A protein has these predicted regions:
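Charge-rich alpha-helical segments
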Residues: 1-88
Length: 88
């Protein structure tokens, strides 16, 4: 399994990986969410998330295992890569 050290912007809380991301505006935040939705669908692993204006809060957990799995670490890493494109 991945080490949390490989995801320095994520926190492990309540049996989930969690991260808050900020964007220039709502359009960038929503565009980011659309891009992540495509990644999540391909992986068949979907985040719990919320959006308020330019802020997106993400929570990743694997309900089947009752906690964090390799799938969560993999999706978190992919989310970080997508965020790099939007954080320019």
């Amino acid at each position: 399994m991945h080490d949390l050290a490989s995801l320095p912007h994520w926190q492990l809380r309540d049996n989930a990986l969690q991260r808050e991301l900020r964007f220039r505006d709502f359009v960038d935040a929503f565009g980011f969410m659309a891009a992540v939705a495509l990644c999540a669908e391909r992986a068949n692993h979907h985040p719990e998330w919320s959006n308020v204006y330019n802020c997106v809060n993400i929570r990743l957990t694997t309900h089947d295992t009752g906690g964090v799995s390799e799938r969560d670490f993999a999706l978190a890493a992919e989310i970080d890569r997508v965020y790099e494109r939007f954080a320019q």
